[in-house]
Amino acid sequence: MKKHDNIYAKALNKVDDFKFDESVVDVFPDMIQRSVPGYETIVHTIGELAKSSVTPNSMVYDLGCSLGAASLSVSRAVSANTCEIIGVDASSAMVERCRRVVQTFTLPNPISIEQGLAQDVDINNASMVVMNFTLQFIPPSDREGLLASIYKGLNPGGILVLSEKVKHPTRSGNELLIDLHHQFKRDNGYSELEVSQKRAALEKVMLTDTFNEHETRLKKVGFADVVMWYKCYNFTSMVAIKA
């Protein structure tokens, strides 16, 4: 049974920067479902994309794997013994919990979970790389280099699935999307206090780009095409394809 997210339910004297610590890990499944519109659709579709993209004897990397939802989706969607999946997360608490989650299943394709920064992962022989709401937490100065490393490590025809919270290029449009997202959270039981304190906690650690900035950067490092396949409010998922 999912634990209820009430991390920001009481007024805090000081709202610290958001981090994926033990308190967040404990409530993460509830938090992500109530905060990200279409999260289940995104995770399911990552598996669907894997069916047509993951090739025999290749690697799949899930960078910023959290509790392994995307890794599990890929493992179950692809024919048995097709690939090896490596999930990587910077949070020690998340890695420890993710390993426990993964070990509870008998999986068609093996998943190993490692602790580390996405920027430090050596991508090789990859048919698919997933970053599901990860790049937005990586320092902007590191983003292009990370994407270049992913592109280099992907086999021809390989894909990067990149899901991100994005900002709209106009101020009024961006505020509209933020308002819609905040209402989505209220509809899912978060109070005004929770919404405002969570926003303050994320302000300095989650730095978003526009879709055009993502597309330009992905094409700059070599990707032949970038397809936005999902968007709701200021949340999107895209597929970058290596020719």
UniProtKB/Swiss-Prot annotation:
Its EC number is 2.1.3.-. HAMAP family: Cx_SAM_synthase. GO terms for biological process: tRNA wobble uridine modification. Catalyzes the conversion of S-adenosyl-L-methionine (SAM) to carboxy-S-adenosyl-L-methionine (Cx-SAM). S-adenosyl-L-methionine binds at residues 39, 64-66, 132, 199. The keyword Membrane does not apply. It holds the Pfam family Methyltransf_25. Keywords: S-adenosyl-L-methionine, Transferase. It catalyses: prephenate + S-adenosyl-L-methionine = carboxy-S-adenosyl-L-methionine + 3-phenylpyruvate + H2O. This is Carboxy-S-adenosyl-L-methionine synthase. Disulfide bonds: none annotated. The gene is cmoA. Homodimer. The keyword Transferase applies. GO terms for molecular function: carboxyl- or carbamoyltransferase activity; S-adenosyl-L-methionine binding.
